[in-house]
């Protein structure tokens, strides 16, 4: 009997494109959450320029370096997976989807660490909580949790499929 798990290059490339879009959107929304939306929500009525100026006066600048490094690293990793999928014309959909799910799962702790310094700077300057004030950070964590659940389901299904294939083909 022939192997029933065949490469599906077109479907794999479509999955990679969707995964790239999801990972890039996560990085962009995460950076905007940390650098724009959260400061504006933490200090209602102030402009971003006023918030940044007050933070700089308090020697608690809202620096973007780590945030942008986090976002760009996610986009670079997503690009690598996309390019490998396009170049390898024998990619299967499952591993491509799994790669992007892993990126989305690990984006959450990265987002937390990238946002920790700016959040504490906001807290120290304006005497507010260092936690997220805008809702988008929580949405990103929900996306990561859903990605973890999807990854677990994907792994279980792949294991069951491999076991069934081994039983059928000895």
Question: Whereabouts are the PLM-identified features?
Answer:
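Cytosolic juxtamembrane helix and N-cap/initiation of the first transmembrane helix
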Residues: 1-40, 154-163, 170
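Cytoplasmic juxtamembrane regions at transmembrane-helix boundaries
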Residues: 2-14, 80-106, 161-170
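Membrane-interfacial loop-to-transmembrane-helix junctions in polytopic alpha-helical membrane proteins
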Residues: 4, 8-11, 56-63, 88-91, ...
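Hydrophobic alpha-helical transmembrane segments of polytopic
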Residues: 15-23, 71, 95, 99-102, ...
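Aromatic-anchored segments of alpha-helical transmembrane domains
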Residues: 23-28, 102-112
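Hydrophobic alpha-helical transmembrane segments
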Residues: 66-90, 94, 145-148
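Alpha-helical transmembrane segments of multi-pass integral membrane proteins
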Residues: 108-170
